[in-house]
Amino acid sequence: MFKFLVIVVFVFSFSFSNNDNVYSLISNPRNISIGKIHASIDNISNTFDSPILLNNNNNIYLSVDRYTNLYSVYYLSYCIYAKNQSNLLLGMVRREINNNFNTNSAWEDDGYPDLEDIDYTQIYNFSDKETGLLIAYNRLIDNNFIMGINFKPIFHRVDNISSIGFSFDVRYVIKMKKNQISFGIDNILAFKKWDSGLLEKFDLNGYLATAINISDRNIIFYEYNMANGSKLGLETKIIDNLFIRTGLNENDFTFGFGLQLKNIDLDYAYINNNSEIFTNNHSVGFNINLDN
């Protein structure tokens, strides 16, 4: 019955897609650089993107996404505990959109205004800040079959209006010798309740992804996501600790690199949005292992 329910919810999620919130963004620069794919890797940098298994507690992850001067997104993840069969992770995401202008009181809304009708003294700058707290529980259900559940409270303030919301995800990863399959159901029961009285709801979203090791040094990634369609990516190991990546989806061309050091992993992604508004963006992330 449980398996049937999972299949029904997953199929239903592919019928609707409208998920514009801070959790809808891919957080790991590695996954961004391969086309913004939910690729699974047992690293705390994947806390927001897919289920993971960890072998130690002392892992901290920090990343920053910079979208020109329009907005920035910050991610922080920490492992609360990690065992052979399960782990519990805590994450925080913060999106800040600055340099917004409120013109509601600058003129009377009776059509297109003449320049002399605009009172520029009534135009003021305001910010849009959204903060999410992620509680991720991952468990090994069977050999190479991982299940993850994400609980996602969210707080959002736009100018002088605030909201509080909640949603959760159910995600799975199946690992095989040379490839893996992952799929997820996101934004389950997602909503925001604004202090203005508005109840904002978000539709279910789903994805299905695969990664295939075509050689010892090359991995091909593919994902179909209801929000963004098809995505394709490639990761190549140049030397033991250096990786080059590239990806493509319907909106972006991406590439980047990864460098694995003794105590720190560094990942960088460059995003060409093909957009005059967002132009080209950058994402950088650090995974710090405190055990070594």
Can you say where each PLM-predicted feature lies in the sequence?
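Subset of outer-membrane beta-barrel
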Residues: 18-292
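Sec-dependent N-terminal signal peptides
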Residues: 2-15
